[in-house]
Amino acid sequence: MRALEANLLKFLKKSSQFIIPIYQRNYSWTDKQCTQLWDDIMRTGTDGRIHAHFIGSIVYVERALSTVSSQESLLVIDGQQRLTTCTLLIAALAEFFEQHKIPELLNSFSAKKLHNYYLTNPEEEGERHFKLILSETDKDTLLAILKNTPQPERFSSRIQENYEQFQKLIQENQDKLEQICRGLDKLVIVEVALDRTQDNPQLIFESMNSTGLELSQADLIRNYILMGLEPDLQAELYRDYWRKMEQLFGQEAYSQYFDDFMRHYLTAKTGNIPNIRQVYSEFKLFAHTHFSNNVKELVADIYTYAGYYCAFALNKETNPALKETFTDLRELKVDVAYPFLLDAYHTYKQEGLSTDEMCQIVRLVESYVFRRAVCNIPTNSLNKTFASLARNLDKTNYVESLQAELLILPSYRRFPSDEEFLCEIKIRDSYNFARRIYLLRKLENYGRKEKVNVNEYTIEHIMPQNPNLSDEWQADLGSDWQKVQQTYLHTLGNLTLTAYNSEYSDRPYVYKRDQVKDGDGNAIGLSSSPLNLNKNLPKEYWNEEQINLRAERLSVLAAKIWSIPYLTQERLSHYQPQKNTETTYNITDHPHLMLNAAMHTLFQTLRQQILAFDECVSEEFLKLYVAYKAETNFVDIIPQAKRLRLVLNMRFADIQDPRGLCRDITNLGKWGNGDVEVRLDNFDDLTYVMGLIRQSFDYQMIKD
């Protein structure tokens, strides 16, 4: 490897050609990065005290260790973003010089020299004519700019937009052309030439990913897969799989969602959820473990699952029935279910499920998630529930085993029953519910063949929100009208949809229902509404009784829409785990708690406070310690003669312990689970120690 400081323009002039390998990410600099480069150039070109401005490194591979004086094409390993952006700026400047017939500036800036020195190789033809050849997605767009020809049908919007931005900036600063040219002439890079036979481009590439626009996890994965392959295989895999995958996503969606897809893919394949910042590291381990000898099979598998993801997550599904179910699920924003859906969709595509069965599965997930949201069950556990869900299913009876698996989930993972769901949906604040539009849309469109676009309507409170209700409203609601309004205002029974919210305002109920008219005298009251939500409203008054009656009717409908599956106890027992026949323990198996009254009292107080954290916390007495679990163990208590020894299941570096009571037991032999130990022997420290335990509980509940 050889690294040299170089003037950018001189570097471009003496270089024959740069090629962006197919494994590199697409051009991705935005207006923000382009504006920053422009500002740096203008500042540098204006200030005579600034002799150079460093813009980063250009790392390339050549066949032998030499300078760029050789005429071979150079593969760019790092620096394509700044190299491409500078090329766009120079192209825009050359075009302006040519159109406005600008004479040569600073003895080296003219339309001809800008083209022949920095953009093209005048004596070459075909692609060799151009200094910079981008990867497949961007290549034709840049070449169209350099050749001044129309853009292809599928062009790179990022390249075109940034080129137009530079055109605009040059136009706005045409009285400062010398400063622009002088600033360009002061740009400096570090050119890093790698020897293909001695240097590892992948390791160097990873180590240098610290400047410019940060590479995504997906960019790193693509480079990892393709960079080390022979050129022919590299081109084949890119052409047959990766390029098709990019096109399947679309340019913007690929940039926005491919990282998420890879995380869901790894979760589906391994059952473990990678930290969002560790997807690349986890992928390398996965690839080495499962596809170490067959990179083509790996890329083909990613491509296959990417097709599944695009179908349900990016609205690419072609089957009408499935498309509708996926649309509803996306509106719920339950990305955590995607690893499970990847598995289900794979089974579907392998003809292990019919379309109807696949729809049932999606509707079941939708009901499970929505019922939990209505019942305000914490969502912390959903990602782990769906990460491992498919592994527990009988693939020969997928739907029924999924129904059973969801029905037997305990406690905070539970599928809310009809009783719980019906109670909560009637009394909860539905107006300030994040999924209120989804709720009303589904209720309105149940049974409709021609769906209503509820986005054309606004939410109407039948009983108004105004705390200063009119005499008519007070009479309808009765002597406790304030309590009735406070209790039922935002509940489902009092909410509907209308296009005439301003016309209804706070007017009396009978007026809202029957008397309001538009400018042409047409009735536009609730009784004239075409919406199902506005049918069967009472004629004379609106009060607590009527709100409850409507809430009851709508809640029964909701239970049909978001239904819970039914299995006989016999079928359910078939899927329930076998009861543990191992030895069980209880408090009597811990003599230090039974024989020492002080330790017994301290332990009982401590356990009660731990169990009060959340209903999801469970307690298990083991032979040597007592475990407290949420997602996993978060604290284990080891009773001793004079103290309780607590092991917290979190990293020692993450614990906040200003009093310094904790001890680092990482890599030490121990009972319990975790790297943090704290000892408790008196009630004075109980509150402080509970704060430490709470940290471990929160850590288990929120960690990815």
PLM region descriptions:
Residues 43-72, 390-534:
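Betabetaalpha-Me/HNH-type nuclease active-site subdomain
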Residues 218-221, 226-437, 525, 534, ...:
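A cross-family structural signal marking well-folded subdomains
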Residues 2-276, 509, 516-572:
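Glycine- and hydrophobic-rich flexible loops that cap the catalytic core of alpha/beta enzyme folds
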Residues 596-616:
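Amphipathic alpha-helical segments
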